[in-house]
Amino acid sequence: MSAAAALKNIEIIEKENLVDNAATVGEYFKNQLMGLKENHKIIGDVRGLGLLLSVELVSDRRTKIGFPKELRVAERLNQKFRENGLIFRVGSEILNIGPPLCITTSEVDEIVSVLDKSLGELSTEVDIK
């Protein structure tokens, strides 16, 4: 039974060109995140391949120093995301992004818009160098 399910998954991945979509939309997503880095000092680095991406949050971009735990940056950012309509798991100062392989560029734009707004709000509350 599990082999049949695996074969069906492979069939769907091939039929819907999900590998190509992951590469194309992943590159677009990463470029959008790099644009956010230009506008938000809180972003120390953006890295990844395809749709597996990470955004590192820092208090000082030059030294890549994180935030003191008592600032609860991850918890506060999670709250900002929820307030702005995005459910996102932030467990540390690294946002790990792994959306579905079928994500579209317009959906990426929506996510990036909320990231932009939420990071902007958080940046006004914490000291960033």
Which positions does each model-derived feature cover?
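Conserved N-terminal phosphate-binding loop of PLP-dependent enzymes in the Aspartate aminotransferase
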Residues: 1-129
